[in-house]
Design a protein with these regions (language model features):
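Nucleic-acid endonuclease domains
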Residues: 1-160
Length: 160
């Protein structure tokens, strides 16, 4: 029930503070993630929070970092994700197929490997550090190092 404890009267109706806070949050997301499908942002934030809380509570990691990386690519670059387990790439950005690889907080090095046979023209590498802060870098396939054993191996520091 809306009333003076959780809302204010404006133009003949009650307006809840929750509605105002949601609108403010929506605007802040727009400023932080201008390319995002904003409906994905709360899912991304909740999933990241659950992963961090689980790690803080148990000392173990959930197997969700790939999904977190893909969602981060969707909200930071506007990558349109394919259905789960689609072969060759994780999504599209305009006319480019994008493969997303995630460096997890527990990984001992900052390398990712991607199959040379994959159907992608851009590689997005998302790094989640031990404090669960994210950053990402994108590289064109033509700028990847030469493949060895059917895989490209890319160091985070080598991506411009």
């Amino acid at each position: 029930m809306l009333g003076p404890d959780n809302a204010f009267w404006d133009d003949g109706e009650w307006v809840s503070w929750n509605d105002i806070n949601r609108q403010i949050q929506y605007k802040e997301w727009g400023a932080k993630y201008p390319n995002a499908d904003r409906s994905l942002i709360p899912i991304f934030e909740d999933l990241l929070s659950v992963a961090e809380d689980y790690h803080d509570t148990t000392g173990s990691h959930l197997q969700v970092y790939g999904d977190i990386g893909e969602l981060f690519g969707a909200i930071t670059y506007g990558v349109k994700l394919h259905r789960n387990y689609a072969q060759g790439s994780d999504g599209r950005l305009g006319d480019d197929f994008v493969e997303v690889k995630t460096i997890t907080p527990f990984k001992s090095n900052d390398y990712v490997e991607v199959k040379a046979s994959g159907n992608f023209s851009k590689l997005l590498v998302v790094k989640i550090n031990q404090h669960f802060e994210l950053s990402c870098r994108m590289i064109s396939r033509k700028n990847l190092p030469k493949a060895k054993g059917g895989k490209h191996r890319i160091n985070w520091l080598e991506i411009a």
